[in-house]
Regions:
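A short acidic, amphipathic alpha-helical/loop segment
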Residues: 11, 61-68, 88
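A short helix->loop->beta-strand "cap" motif at the edges of active sites that frequently abuts
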Residues: 17, 70-74, 94
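Internal active-site segments that recognize and position negatively charged phosphoryl groups
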Residues: 1-21
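Short, polar loop motifs at secondary-structure junctions
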Residues: 4-7, 22-28, 80-84
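Short, conserved loop/helix-junction motifs that constitute active-site signature segments
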Residues: 12, 44-45, 67-72
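C-terminal functional extensions of proteins
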Residues: 76-149
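Structural motif
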Residues: 49-53, 76
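Short acidic low-complexity segments
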Residues: 34-46
Length: 149
């Protein structure tokens, strides 16, 4: 995993699966049996599944991490900061993106401004490289056809 995401870390630990988390913030560093939080991305080389928080897109660390994902069959980037077209990421080997879209803007802004949890005002989604996602080019073609009709 890239990025210490406490709710997800707890879910994985409760199941008892081995988990390595790469983090930039030293205050999260720890090791306990099959669980480790490290500063060393190379420790992901042997992982078969990788989950990254969307922060890897925001802080532009994804390119430096990709070589460490080469043995992973599944690579996910998840979180509210993943609202982007997936094509360039799919082309680089990312298999799924999970994000959220705002359903109720007024409710969302009220909750966000009050620094409260805003999940109730959003809907989660997953885009998969192997799904029916048509690709950016096809989306643009469809939009252009719609404008010309």
């Amino acid at each position: 995993m890239v990025g210490y995401f406490p709710p997800l870390v707890e879910q994985v630990r409760q199941v008892g699966l081995p988990l390595t988390v790469v983090e930039l913030d030293e205050r999260w560093l720890q090791q306990d049996g099959q669980f480790e939080v490290t500063l060393e991305p190379e420790k992901l080389n042997d992982c078969s599944k990788i989950i990254c928080t969307g922060t890897v897109l925001v802080n532009q660390t994804i390119d430096g991490l990709l070589p460490c994902f080469r043995n992973a069959s599944q690579i996910f980037i998840v979180g509210p900061t993943v609202g982007c077209l997936p094509d360039p990421l799919f082309d680089r080997g990312i298999t799924r993106l999970g994000g959220c879209s705002v359903l109720d803007t007024v409710q969302f802004l009220g909750l966000w401004t009050a620094q409260e949890k805003w999940r109730a005002s959003t809907r989660r989604y997953v885009l998969s490289r192997d799904s029916t996602y048509p690709g950016c080019s096809q989306l643009l073609n469809n939009a252009t056809r719609g404008l010309n009709n």
